[in-house]
Every structure is written in structure tokens, then in C-alpha cells.
From Swiss-Prot:
Recorded GO MF terms: calcium ion binding; channel activity; toxin activity
Domain notes: The transmembrane domains are believed to be involved in pore formation in target cells.
UniProt-recorded name of the protein: Leukotoxin
Species, as recorded: Mannheimia haemolytica
Encoding gene (name): lktA
Hemolysin-type calcium-binding repeats: 715-732, 733-750, 751-768, 769-786, 789-806
PROSITE patterns named in the record: HEMOLYSIN_CALCIUM
């Protein structure tokens, strides 16, 4: 018995493979037939050639074929002339069962007769008398063919609706007709397939006494316990409910909640009704066949049917319509600004969503039926042939639908394509996608107008130039991919606006911004004395883009980006005092990235700035920068961004204001331009579009070099910078970090900023301000001025020659403590911060201990000055320290401050000191409140603190 069932199982497997191969071939033929039928009449014709002779001994008989065709409503046409001869040139009607004419699908009577003459088929049909209940063999064959072709023909109705540019509701109705057709034809097919499946596998005897097995087409009325008003109508009701829900989803005027509800209704109707109907029908077959119908078996069947249904598919469809709804809302604003692309995207989502809803409903029903039959077959070899054939025919129909679905999607996409092309034609050839960026920019401008109009006041500039880079937009990218117009899309577009006295001006007459050539010209300043050039968003590198769409697979395309790059931005300024913040100008290009999106190979875009007249300020960015300051007092700032420590060596410069600045930017994150890929899907078609955009990418360390000309002051970074001055007058500000500053020759202005700095004035009359931190200060030769404030920390000063001064700019002289510590003079303020003047007493002590010692150095500071101009000389300090045994008494300091003669002397002397410090203030640090350059509140650099510089006299 075991071997018998093994042989049966093997036979079933071989039969299944044969059936599968045949069904696949049939599916291809049917699809081809359907495509050819688009322009022909949709009817089935039984074609009988003139003078055809048939063998009544072997065949079914021409009379039976004609009778069966008439019963089934198939037109019978006998060849009288050559009016349908063209059928022979289509699918070879004389050689095949199926053929095409301009009037419809042709069934070849000779080929059908040959089919019926085959031994296996003839025997199979002949032994099915009890099951077919009097139907002839011919009618069985014709009924099955008619059922399958009916589905194909209904599918052609849907295709025809698409070809006529029907709206979404029409498409849904066409889908409904297809659903109804499938319900009817699946039922008819099962009747036919039951008979064939039973006999082909030589198991007919097992089923000959199964009452009602072939009655599904008659709504199961022959099954025990079920009539056409119950179970059969449930099947129809479930499928029709699903199709009705598809209509709701197609209604663009329906609310979002209703559409979401429809999506769940679609799933629930199919899951509920189809599971119940299919499971009950299959159980009834098993009962009729005398097979088990226990709880576990019923559960297996029901669960298998349920698993064949995917509610997530319907949820995805509902999401599509929700997305379309949100796009429609989003599109309203941009439509008013002249761009309707978002609405086109919504139209695409609605159209494809409708198609998805219809096809998914049909496929769900087919999957449920096939799954249920297969589950029933799991416990019985008897039902296996039926299961295989049912699965096969539903698979053929599903395949046809899926192939049709892609064509439907492409049709919707083609409509979008045509609308874009038509718009460009009607608008003088303007790029549709560029128009989209224009609309995005205008919306952004409207949203930020209040902020922008306030910039003149906030930035303290008569004119503000705002440059905005509109970067890649995913909706625009989707539209370009769907419409197959990726070659026309741009990575973005740059815009410029001007504001004066809180008014928005047309900037095209005031500013030249040419991203293709790399030109930014703001030299036409008009009456404006001050202007601020603000890069609101990262500006992409200059150059032009070209794209090329290539096919990489059956449904895969990529639009490659080719960039004709310009190697530099050329910036031109005029007579106004201008501020440029270049930190938002992208200079680094990520040429090669690793798997983690880290930049491992870069390219650089240089900035060349010609500033002209005026007192200008430039904040340098991440790459090589060349600056010609021109006339005026010009500052170059490295205090914004995190672009490496400076090394400046101007010792060999032959022209004042000329510097070479070397920077090493350590590994970290910095603004880079990189190329990415946007993906848009149209059913199976995948469109990839390359585009460039800015991003903070992790990079390896790199070197960069800046060339400065006619620059009066350099402000350093937050790193440990090194400054070596020229033989001319230099002005350096270390900023944050532990900086080393050497003024070299010239009358230098040196500021340490934050951090424990080392500053050496070198030769010349230098102004030295250590700033916050414990600084080591050396004046060198010349008449030097040192400044200390409360909160600056503990400074150490070494001085040798000249008439030097130390100003405690926010402390009263009488509040300070003077005392001798070893060879040094230590001055302590009220915050207990100490300024140590190294070796103040060393020469005097050497003179006391060494006979005939002659002093060779003067390590003292000649005047120490309080915040109100009161002062004490080095001579007075020596006398009072001597008098107080190493410490000046507070009362003595008070006398010094209160002494009229000393005050009078202080007033007279203050004039000269005031002039000196006033001169020094022209070279003040960016830490000076008078030099803190305004930025929009949202863009303020916390490293630029405001420290009031109080004059010492």
C-alpha cells in the first residue's frame, strides 16, 4: 500500500510539473493574445475551415463542437471565402488551437478535434460522464478555454480604459468589471478542471460518486448542506465588497479616514468572506469524498486560506492614498507660486493606488482559493490534482495581471511626462524642475521675510546681501524619476536677495551671482557705507551639471551626473566696509567615500577675494583662500568653524600686510560636497538619479594654505596657533587655545585671547594683551604697554628695555597689593589674581651684593596705572617696598592716589598715554566689544565674547 501511494505521489509530482509547464506556456500565449487583441473585436469564434473532414470514429465530432459552442454562446463561423484567412498569420490558427483575427479570438475546430482525438484526453473526458452530467466532451473543453479567455478579455477592458486616459474612477470601475468576470470564470474553470484533474491522474474512480464536485459554477447548489443562497453568494459578496472598497480608494474626494477605512474594509471583507467560503467549500468536498473533516483539518484549511491573504498589502495601498492626500495639501502653496509638480506626484499616487487596489483585491481572492484547495489536498492524494490545477490557473491569471499592472503604472507615469513636456513647451522651454526650485525658494523667502528684514539692524549694516542655496528636493527627484526626465533635473539652485533699511530690494541689479562661472560680485554698493554678505545655507561649488540616463537592467535605470567644475569662487567687493562669512561656502568636495560614508579622498575649491576699499572683515572657511584687502583696515578671522590651527611665518615678508597662513585640519567632521543617489520607483521600474549636496562628513586630516595681502589684523582659531610677525607692524589675536605669538620687529598689537598664551613683542613699541588665562608676556625692546583685567588669570611679565607701562584697566590702584617675592614684584587684585613682573629687584640686589656691579638691564615697568588714570612709578614702588619691608602698605598707596601733585602729573601724562592707547585701539582684538562683528542671533559664534577694553588714561 505504501509503494502504491509512493507511485501515486511520484505520478502527481510529474503531472504537476507537466501542468505547470503547460500553464506557463499558456500564460505567455494568452498575454500575447491579449496584447494583439487591443485593436480587435472582443469575441470568441469557433472557426471551421471550408471542406474540413473529420474522423467521427476518433474525434468528438463536428456536430458536437458546434452544439457545444452554441450552448456556450460562442459564435460559429464556417469558412465561405478568405474573410478570416489572416488568422493564419497571427498565431498560426491552422497549426494552433488559438488564433487572432480583426474580429476576435479564433478557436480552430481542426486543432480542437485533434486534441479530443488524443488518447489520454479523450479517455479522461469520456470517463467523466457522471460528473459532467450530460455535458459533451467538446463542451467541457470549450467551457474551460472560454473561462480563461474571459479573464483575459476583461483585462483588455481595463487596458482600453487606460489607453483612453480615463480618470481614476473609470479605472476602478474597469477593475470592478474584471473582478466580476474573474468570479464567474474561476467558478467555470473549477468545474472543468475538476473533471480534467480527476481523470488525468487516473483517480476518477475515487471521485465518480462525489456528488456536486463539478457544481461550483452553479454556485455549489449540488453540495450537501449548501445552496446557492448561502455559501456561493458569500464568495461573490466578499469579492464584490473588496472591489467596492477599491472604488472608495479611487475617489479623490473621499476623506483620508474614509480611504483608510476602505483599506481595512478591503482586507476584512476578503479575509472574512473568502476564508469562510473557500474553507467551507473545501470541507464539503472532503465530507462528500468520505475524507476527514475534523477540527485540526478544518483549522489547517482556514489558517492556510488566511495566510494567503495579506492585509498589509491593503494597508500599503491606503498609505499611497494618504501620501497623495498630503501631497495635494502641500501642493496648494507651490501651485500659487507657479509650480504644480507636487500635485502631479499626488496624481501619480492616486492613479497607481487605484491600480494597486484593484489588482491586489483580485490577487487576494485568487491566492485564498488556491491556498485553501492546497490545504485540503495536504491530507489527501485525491484532491491533489485539483489543487495543482487550481493553483496553476490562478497563477496564470495573476501573472497576466502583474504584467498588466506594470503597463498600467507606466501609462500613469507617461501622462505625468506629457504634462511636464507640454508645460515646458508653453513656457518658452523653461526647465520644469528649475521652476520647482524657484517655487521652493519663494516659499522660504516668504517664511523668513520678517527675520530677513530685521538683518540690517541686527548685523549693523546698511545693506545685507543674503545668498540662499536651494538644495536637492526629494519630491522634485521623485517626479523626475517617475516621468523619465532625470536628465533635466538640477541638484539645486542659488539665489540672492538684498535688504536696505528694512526693505527688500531686487538684487539682480546690485549683485552678480553666477554659480556656473563662480562669480560673486558685490562691488556695486551705491550709497551704502557698510554691507554684510550672509550665506544663509551652504553654497555648493561652482560649475555646470550634465546628466545622462542609462539602462542597467531590465527595469533599472541610472541618471549619471557629470560636473564641469570651476576651480574657484571669485569674490569682488567695492568701496563699502563689508563683512563676508565664508564658512558656509562649500570648498571641500568628497571625491571618494568609504562604506561608512567617511571622506577618504577630496578635492578643493579655492576662494579668491578682492576686497577693495573700506574696513572689511572676512571669516575664512575650510579651504584655500586668497585675500587682497585693498585699502582700509581689513581683518581676516579664523575664529568660526573648526578648520585647524594656524601657523603664520611672516619673518621674510617684504610687504606690510602680507602673510602666508598654513593650516592643518585634523580628522573630524567638516562641510563637504558629496554625490548621492535618489531612487524613485514606478512599479518594477527603478530610477536612480545622482545629485550633489552638502553634508557634514567625517574626513581625514588635510593641509591648506591661505595667501593674505594688504591685511591689517589676523584673528586665530580655538586651536594652538603660532604667529611669527614681520618686520612691519603686525596685529595678531590668538583667540582660544594655547597660542604662541611673536611680534618680531615693528610696533605690534598682540592679543592672546583665551588660553595660557606665550606672547613676545620683540623689537618695537608693542601693545600686549594676554587676555584670559595664565599668560607669559615678554615686551622686548621698545616702549611697551601691557594690559590686565579682572578675570584674566595669573600673568607673568618679563621686560628689559624702554619706557614700559602696565594698565589695570578695571581696578583702582589703591585696591591692588604690591609685594616683593624673591627677585620679583607681585601685584594682586581683589580677585586674588596675580601679575608677576619677573626680576624687578634683581639688578638692585646684584648691586648690593656684588662690588662695583654695573646694571646692564632694566627689568622694571616704568609706570603702573589704575582704571582712573592714577599711577605709580617704578621709583615709587621701590621706595615704598623698601619702606614697608617688602610690601607697600595700603595707606601708602592711598596717599599716592590722593596726592595732588601725583594726580596733576597723571593728568598731564595721560594725554600722551591716551594717544598711545587710542592708536593701539585701532588694532583692537575681536574680543573687544567694539570689534565683535554682529551675526544673526541664530548664527552667533560663542567663541567671540565681548570684553570691554577700558583705556588706561
Amino acid at each position: 500500500m505504501g509503494n502504491k501511494f509512493t507511485n501515486i505521489s511520484t505520478n502527481l509530482r510529474n503531472s504537476w510539473l507537466t501542468a505547470k509547464s503547460g500553464l506557463n506556456n499558456a500564460g505567455q500565449s494568452l498575454a500575447k493574445a491579449g496584447q494583439s487583441l487591443k485593436t480587435g473585436a472582443k469575441k470568441i469564434i469557433l472557426y471551421i475551415p471550408k471542406d474540413y473532414q473529420y474522423d467521427t470514429e476518433k474525434g468528438n465530432g463536428l456536430q458536437d463542437l458546434v452544439k457545444a459552442a452554441q450552448e456556450l454562446g460562442i459564435e460559429v463561423q464556417k469558412e465561405e471565402g478568405n474573410d478570416i484567412a489572416k488568422a493564419q498569420t497571427s498565431l498560426g490558427t491552422i497549426q494552433n488551437v488559438l488564433g487572432l483575427t480583426e474580429r476576435g479570438i479564433v478557436l480552430s475546430a481542426p486543432q480542437l478535434d485533434k486534441l479530443l482525438q488524443k488518447t489520454k484526453v479523450g479517455q479522461a473526458i469520456g470517463s467523466a460522464e457522471n460528473l459532467t452530467k450530460g455535458f459533451s466532451n467538446a463542451k467541457t473543453v470549450l467551457s474551460g478555454i472560454q473561462s480563461i479567455l474571459g479573464s483575459v478579455l476583461a483585462g483588455m477592458d481595463l487596458d482600453e480604459a487606460l489607453q483612453k486616459n480615463s480618470n481614476e474612477l473609470t479605472l476602478a470601475k474597469a477593475g470592478l468589471e474584471l473582478t466580476n468576470s474573474l468570479i464567474e470564470n474561476i467558478a467555470n474553470s473549477v468545474k472543468t478542471l475538476d473533471a480534467f484533474g480527476d481523470q488525468i491522474n487516473q483517480l476518477g474512480s475515487k471521485l465518480q460518486n462525489v456528488k456536486g464536485l463539478s457544481s461550483l459554477g452553479d454556485k455549489l447548489k449540488g453540495l450537501s448542506g449548501f445552496d446557492k443562497t448561502s455559501l456561493g453568494l458569500d464568495v461573490v459578496s466578499g469579492l464584490l465588497s473588496g472591489a467596492t472598497a477599491a472604488l472608495v480608494l479611487a475617489d479623490k474626494n473621499a476623506s483620508t479616514s474614509r480611504k483608510v477605512g476602505a483599506g481595512f474594509e478591503l482586507a476584512n471583507q476578503v479575509v472574512g468572506n473568502i476564508t469562510k467560503a473557500v474553507s467551507s467549500y473545501i470541507l464539503a468536498q472532503r465530507v462528500a469524498a468520505g475524507l476527514s473533516s475534523t477540527g485540526p483539518v478544518a483549522a489547517l484549511i482556514a489558517s492556510t486560506v488566511s495566510l494567503a491573504i495579506s492585509p498589509l498589502a491593503f494597508a500599503g495601498i491606503a498609505d499611497k492614498f494618504n501620501h497623495a492626500k498630503s501631497l495635494e495639501s502641500y501642493a496648494e502653496r507651490f501651485k500659487k507660486l507657479g509650480y504644480d509638480g507636487d500635485n502631479l506626484l499626488a496624481e501619480y499616487q492616486r492613479g497607481t493606488g487605484t491600480i494597486d487596489a484593484s489588482v491586489t483585491a483580485i490577487n487576494t481572492a485568487l491566492a485564498a482559493i488556491a491556498g485553501g484547495v492546497s490545504a485540503a489536498a495536504a491530507g489527501s492524494v485525491i484532491a491533489s490534482p485539483i489543487a495543482l490545477l487550481v493553483s496553476g490557473i490562478t497563477g496564470v491569471i495573476s501573472t497576466i495581471l502583474q504584467y498588466s499592472k506594470q503597463a498600467m503604472f507606466e501609462h500613469v507615469a507617461n501622462k505625468i511626462h506629457n504634462k511636464i513636456v507640454e508645460w515646458e513647451k508653453n513656457n518658452g522651454g523653461k526647465n520644469y524642475f528649475e521652476n520647482g526650485y524657484d517655487a521652493r525658494y519663494l516659499a522660504n523667502l516668504q517664511d523668513n521675510m520678517k527675520f530677513l528684514l530685521n538683518l540690517n539692524k541686527e548685523l549693523q549694516a546698511e545693506r545685507v546681501i543674503a545668498i540662499t542655496q536651494q538644495q536637492w528636493d526629494s519630491n522634485i527627484g521623485d517626479l523626475a524619476g517617475i516621468s523619465r526626465l532625470g536628465e533635466k533635473v538640477l541638484s539645486g539652485k542659488a539665489y540672492v536677495d538684498a535688504f536696505e533699511e528694512g526693505q527688500h530690494l531686487k538684487a539682480d541689479k546690485l549683485v552678480q551671482l553666477d554659480s556656473a562661472k563662480g562669480i560673486i560680485d558685490v562691488s556695486n554698493t551705491g550709497e551704502a557705507k557698510t554691507q554684510h554678505i550672509l550665506f544663509r545655507t551652504p553654497l555648493l561649488t561652482p560649475g555646470t551639471e550634465k546628466r545622462e540616463r542609462v539602462q542597467t537592467g531590465k527595469y533599472e535605470y541610472i541618471t549619471k551626473l557629470h560636473i564641469n567644475r570651476v576651480d574657484s569662487w571669485q569674490i569682488k567687493d567695492g568701496a563699502a566696509s563689508s563683512t563676508f562669512d565664508l564658512t558656509n561656502v562649500v570648498q571641500r568636495i568628497g571625491v571618494e567615500l568609504d562604506h561608512a560614508e567617511n571622506v577618504i579622498k577630496t578635492k578643493e575649491t579655492k576662494i579668491v577675494a578682492t576686497l577693495g576699499d573700506g574696513d572689511d572683515n572676512v571669516f575664512v572657511g575650510s579651504g584655500t583662500t586668497e585675500i587682497d584687502g585693498g585699502e582700509g583696515y581689513d581683518r581676516v578671522h579664523y575664529s568660526r568653524g573648526n578648520y585647524g590651527a594656524l601657523t603664520i611665518d611672516a619673518t621674510k615678508e617684504t610687504e606690510q600686510g602680507s602673510y602666508t597662513v598654513n593650516r592643518f585640519v585634523e580628522s573630524g567632521k567638516a562641510l563637504h560636497e558629496v554625490t548621492s543617489t535618489h531612487t524613485a520607483l514606478v512599479g518594477n521600474r527603478e530610477e536612480k538619479i545622482e545629485y550633489r549636496h552638502s553634508n557634514n562628513q567625517h574626513h581625514a586630516g588635510y593641509y591648506t594654505k591661505d595667501t593674505l595681502k594688504a591685511v591689517e589684523e589676523i584673528i586665530g582659531t580655538s586651536h594652538n596657533d603660532i604667529f611669527k610677525g614681520s618686520k612691519f607692524n603686525d596685529a595678531f589675536n590668538g583667540g582660544d587655545g594655547v597660542d604662541t605669538i611673536d611680534g618680531n620687529d615693528g610696533n605690534d598689537r598682540l592679543f592672546g585671547g583665551k588660553g595660557d598664551d606665550i606672547i613676545d613683542g620683540g623689537n618695537g613699541d608693542d601693545f600686549i594683551d594676554g587676555g584670559k588665562g595664565n599668560d607669559l608676556l615678554h615686551g622686548g625692546k621698545g616702549d611697551d604697554i601691557f594690559v590686565h583685567r579682572q578675570g584674566d588669570g595669573n600673568d607673568s611679565i618679563t621686560e628689559s628695555e624702554g619706557n614700559d607701562k602696565l594698565s589695570f584697566s578695571d581696578s583702582n590702584l589703591k585696591d591692588l597689593t604690591f609685594e616683593k617675592v624673591n627677585h620679583h614684584l607681585v601685584i594682586t587684585n581683589t580677585k586674588q589674581e596675580k601679575v608677576t613682573i619677573q626680576n624687578w629687584f634683581r639688578e638692585a640686589e646684584f648691586a648690593k651684593t656684588i662690588q662695583n656691579y654695573v646694571a646692564t638691564r632694566d627689568d622694571k615697568i616704568e609706570e603702573i596705572i589704575g582704571q582712573n588714570g592714577e599711577r605709580i612709578t617704578s621709583k615709587q614702588v621701590d621706595e615704598l617696598i623698601e619702606k614697608g619691608n617688602g610690601k607697600i602698605a595700603q595707606s601708602e598707596l592711598t596717599k599716592v592716589v590722593d596726592n595732588y601733585q601725583l594726580l596733576k602729573y597723571s593728568r598731564d601724562a595721560s594725554n600722551s598715554l591716551d594717544k598711545l592707547i587710542s592708536s593701539a585701539s585701532a588694532f583692537t582684538s575681536s574680543n573687544d566689544s567694539r570689534n565683535v562683528l554682529a551675526s544673526p542671533t541664530s548664527m552667533l559664534d560663542p567663541s567671540l565674547s565681548s570684553i570691554q577694553f577700558a583705556r588706561a588714561a
